């Protein structure tokens, strides 16, 4: 990207204190447990966080565009406005027990880039757009990366708008409720390059004493929701050999998920993240179990192999338990 102005590249620095203060101010919205955040997508807290981000961007001379999925695009004009922009961004929504930096750092660092180059009197040849993607986490409305998926042509708008949360509220209705649906058709935006600054979400950098790492590949992801149907029965009066215990089936499949991921190393991972048994009574054998499986690998062949093997093992487990 060509730069013009009074600063030279060797002297270009952001204001780290200002970025930190912005992160801490955003973290006041939707406080969570242990100093983290609960600012799930399309909640009132999400709307408040969006409004604060917009205010900061407009104070920095940026203009907002909003598409029909609620994706926010804050534009800093370049010297040649007809050139395709460079995008910087991530997401402001969090997990229910999320941290202060996951996603938020990628959005607010983009804002800090704009603030800093303005402070230094620098003009870029290309426009810069700081993006906030809606529902990247997917914790409230599955799947993750829903609105960016519509932008990329992976999902259509009807599919996204019909996604439901645990209370039966739809993505579309909640987006309208908080007032952050725009008019722009998703995906109708030229992008010269996209940069996302993100926390590691893992222990490797800290364990190796490193400050920063460069992403070398993305994780392929397979999500599955499983329902096992057994038979409710009294725990005290039903003989062991006559039980159809859906909870036991869930436990065995959970163990299989871990073992299969370990068999596909390096880089493959797997876990059961959500789990519920019904009727969820201490003296009733579960007649139904509902749980989610998360398999990931940068290698498509490994990802496919893990899924195929688990499906075969889960079928045998279900047969064995009746």
Residues covered by each model-derived region:
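Beta-strand segments within the central parallel beta-sheet cores of soluble alpha/beta enzyme folds
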Residues: 67-69, 87, 123-134, 268-274
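Midchain, well-structured core segments that form catalytic/ion-binding scaffolds
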Residues: 135-136, 140-301
């Amino acid at each position: 990207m060509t730069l013009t102005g009074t600063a030279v590249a060797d002297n270009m620095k952001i204001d780290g204190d200002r970025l930190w203060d912005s992160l801490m101010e955003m973290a006041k919205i939707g406080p969570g447990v242990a100093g983290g955040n609960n600012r799930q997508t399309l909640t009132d807290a999400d709307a408040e966080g969006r409004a604060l981000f917009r205010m900061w961007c407009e104070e920095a001379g940026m203009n907002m565009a909003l598409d029909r999925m609620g994706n926010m695009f804050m534009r800093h004009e370049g010297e040649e406005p007809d050139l395709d922009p460079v995008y910087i961004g991530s997401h402001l929504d969090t997990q229910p027990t999320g941290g202060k930096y996951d996603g938020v750092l990628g959005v607010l660092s983009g804002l800090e880039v704009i603030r800093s180059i303005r402070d230094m009197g620098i003009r870029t040849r290309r426009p810069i757009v700081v993006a906030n993607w809606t529902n990247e986490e997917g914790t409230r409305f599955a799947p993750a990366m829903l609105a960016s998926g519509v932008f990329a042509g992976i999902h259509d708008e009807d599919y996204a708008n019909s996604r439901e949360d645990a209370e039966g509220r739809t993505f579309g209705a909640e987006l309208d409720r908080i007032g952050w649906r725009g008019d722009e058709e998703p995906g109708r935006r030229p992008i010269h390059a996209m940069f996302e600054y993100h926390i590691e979400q893992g222990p490797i950098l800290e364990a190796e004493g490193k400050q920063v790492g460069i992403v070398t590949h993305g994780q392929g992801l397979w999500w599955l929701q499983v329902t096992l149907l057994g038979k409710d029965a009294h725990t005290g009066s039903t003989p062991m050999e006559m039980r159809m215990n859906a909870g036991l089936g869930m436990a065995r499949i959970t163990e299989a998920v871990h073992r299969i991921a370990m068999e596909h190393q390096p880089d493959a991972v797997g876990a059961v993240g959500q789990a519920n048994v019904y009727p969820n009574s201490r003296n009733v054998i579960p007649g139904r179990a509902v749980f989610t499986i998360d398999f990931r690998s940068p290698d498509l062949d490994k990802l496919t192999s893990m899924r195929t093997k688990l499906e075969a093992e889960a079928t045998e487990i279900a047969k064995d338990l009746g």
